[in-house]
Amino acid sequence: MPRSQKNDNFIDKTFTVLADIVLKILPTSKEEKEAFSYYRDGMSAQSEGEYAEALENYYEALKLEEDPYDRSYILYNIGLIYASNGEYVKALEYYHQGLELNFKLPQALNNIAVIYHYQGVQAIEDKDTELSKLMFDKAAQYWQQAIKLAPDNYIEAQNWLKTTGRMRNIQGY
């Protein structure tokens, strides 16, 4: 087994043990603990590329989780899976649902921008300049929001915004 895989397994096992301890000692309801358990299992399955299993766990977690902040991360992870599978419309739906519950989720804003940027590139390949401009403008809007929340992140997006003349309304620019 490669060293990096051993380290990953060690980290996964350590996380699982710590999560189990936290679940036992936190003063939370049975439903909250069960929701977290499903969420944790979903993250584990997702990291192993077992997307169908991850989705099952995330959907179970959504049924039980009541906290909007926690639900936003479950929805975000579901969006990640759909994006990984090339199902961009579904991914966008879940990212937006996550943002409705937690507007301070820069990674969701970034991923929405990435999808719109990809669609802009596809439109160029299809020689649809009007659609490409629309998609690139949408990407710019979401990247600007992500950068406002996390100014030290998304350097490639910041460079793209600058080089395309779309960098505006961001503090310091």
UniProtKB/Swiss-Prot annotation:
Keywords: Chloroplast, Membrane, Photosynthesis, Plastid, Repeat, Thylakoid, TPR repeat
Compartments where found: Plastid, Chloroplast thylakoid membrane
Ranges for the TPR repeats: 35-68, 72-105, 120-153
Record-given protein name: Photosystem I assembly protein Ycf3
Any one of the GO CC terms: chloroplast thylakoid membrane
Purpose: Essential for the assembly of the photosystem I (PSI) complex. May act as a chaperone-like factor to guide the assembly of the PSI subunits.
Species for this entry: Pyropia yezoensis (Susabi-nori)
An annotated GO BP: photosynthesis
Domain of life of the organism encoding this protein: Eukaryota
Pfam families, sorted: TPR_1, TPR_8
Family: Belongs to the Ycf3 family.
Membrane topology, from the record: Peripheral membrane protein
